[in-house]
Amino acid sequence: SFQCGRRNDALKFWTLWKAVGTKGLASIVDHLFETSTIARNYVKNNPNYTLYNEGYSLSVCFNYKEFDAKELCTKLHYAKKLLVAYGSFKGEEFVRLVTANAENKEKEILRFFQILEKYADENHLKLKKRAFLKVP
């Protein structure tokens, strides 16, 4: 996957383009957006989640139930369950799933949510609740 602003990204991109061609590259990008749509729709259609971003992006930002996103992501990592990032915007923290792996299919995306939910529900007494930002 490409990083932001790294010098060798141009070489990676050129090599990928030469290997798969323009149509192949388009297919990879389309697939990445399809997997982000699968994840976003899962979050939107599940009342236990709060979605923080809509639109055309590979990042899906959300919270699960009332759990603190930073702590949930950290504990998932230390428990060797998932490695997922968290982010913040305007004082709100959220889980930030980036669907940048072209090998992932729908089953991997759904498995991600299954693992997150199972871990959070089994460890709910050990996880902090998130603080809600009060807007004046």
Regions found by a protein language model. Name each.
Residues A10:
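Catalytic pocket-lining loop regions of alpha/beta-barrel enzymes
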Residues S1-R6, W17, G21-L133:
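Conserved C-terminal alpha-helix-loop-beta "cap" of PLP-dependent enzymes
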